[in-house]
Amino acid sequence: LLQAVCDEDFLALASGLREIMQLPDPKARIDALMMGYARFALHHPNHYRLMFMTPRAPCNQDITQIQQGNTEQDAYVQLKTVVQNAFDAGLFKPELDDFELIAQTLWAGIHGVCSLEIALGHEPWINWKNLETRIEHMQSAILQGVLRNPDAH
C-alpha cells in the first residue's frame, strides 16, 4: 500500500516536471527543474515528507507502477537527463567530470531548503528569511559552484 501511495506521488512529481524537459536552453532547464522540484515539495509538504523525509523500505521493483529510466515517469532520470545534456554541452567546470554527482548535488541543495521549510518553517527560534529568496539563493550558490560560466545565460 505504501508503495502505491509513493508511486502516485512520484508520478505526480515527474508529470509536473515533464514540460521542463522541452525547454531548449540547458541552463534554463536546470533552473526550471530545480524550481519545479521546490514548488512540488512546498505545495505538497505531506506527500514530500513521505517521499523524501521518512525512512522506508527501498522501492520494490516488482510492484512499482513507475518504469525506472522512463523520463515520462521517473523524476530522478529527468534530473539526470537535464544535467547530462548540460554536461554534454560543456556547461560545467572541467574538473567536474561526473554528471550524476552533479545531479545529486543540485538535488541535495534544493532538498535541504525544502525539507528545512517543511520541518522547521514555523519554528520561532529561527528568524527565517523569505522562502523564495532562500530557494533562489541556494540555487544560485550551487550553480555558481558548478557552472563554467554561471552568468553566461
Regions found by a protein language model. Give the residues of each.
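Amphipathic, non-membrane alpha-helical segments in soluble helical-bundle scaffolds
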Residues: 2-3, 7, 27, 68-76, ...
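Short secondary-structure transition hinges
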Residues: 39, 43-81, 85, 91-92, ...
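An amphipathic alpha-helix signature
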Residues: 31, 35, 76, 80-84, ...
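An amphipathic alpha-helix adjacent to DNA-recognition modules
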Residues: 1-18, 31, 35, 76
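Solvent-exposed, amphipathic alpha-helical segments
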Residues: 12-23, 109-116
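Hydrophobic alpha-helical connector segments
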Residues: 18-47, 93, 99-106
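Hydrophobic/aromatic-rich alpha-helical bundle segments in the mid-to-C-terminal region
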Residues: 63-65, 88-138, 149-153
